Amino acid sequence: MTSSEAFPSPNAPNMTHVKRIPTLKNSIFYSFVNSPEGTTIEGYGRKSWRIYHRDVLSVTLDQSSMIINEYKDTPITGEDPRAFVHNGTVYVQDNYLNDCHLYNTKTKEYLKIKTKGKNLSFISHKGRLYFIYYMSPFIMYEVNMTTGDITTVDVEQDGSHNGEYRGGTPGYKYDPILCFKAVLSQQLSASSNMGNPGPNYENIYYGFGHRVYYKDRPFPDGILKHDIFMWVVDFEGGENGKPSLRLYDVSKPANAKNVCDPTSVISINNKKYMVTAESNEWWFVEQEYVTNLYELTPPS
């Protein structure tokens, strides 16, 4: 996100509320993924909001009614699980703070990612797995899928430092409908500043994260807010062909709750939908926890 962009960004897609997805009482943070075969939508959610109750359920989503039609217990535990596809396999990220693991749903094995932090945004690119560690400044690593070791990726830096921007969904392949204006704005900037050639869309990915801040008053007296932003990574978009990252603030719908975390993007009948985990207060308290579905449409 360049400093001159308005809030919300004119290059970000629009969110239109479709429905609330009914879920088991007390369960929270459902992340959905189109199966590698393209036939089903599977998901993973935390069974209870209570701080020490971290069992993860697997579910399937009916693509016509958009209602969960099957719940199953799993051996997975997680804080706020995220699901993504890498090399034809669905992985579930447990997203524990300073103790992140990936669960391979085929082999039923865990891989410990040797890093600290959480809210890592994974991107499967040309058979290799990467993750965004920080949004601002942009920090990216590549994962060794045998050992869990990580290697720093040399990326373009723009000098920004803003800890409000945090990860959410994994990365998805460039979408010409949702991302065109954002990528065009990036390319115009790159062309004027660095003389880069036109983008290679095979190298471009997008996802969504949450921006954390307190409204009206600072912590702990202010109102906790999680707003949504879109990120776009171009693996060759920066100076000297380095990966580049741009952020675009999204206009949150009026019905969205104070804490609105994007968990995943799914495709149904050639349309893109975002799934969110929402509440009015921070987690781990007795309150209404909501799983919402929004249709994503091009920027106005």
Language-model features: locations:
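Beta-propeller domains
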Residues: M1-S300
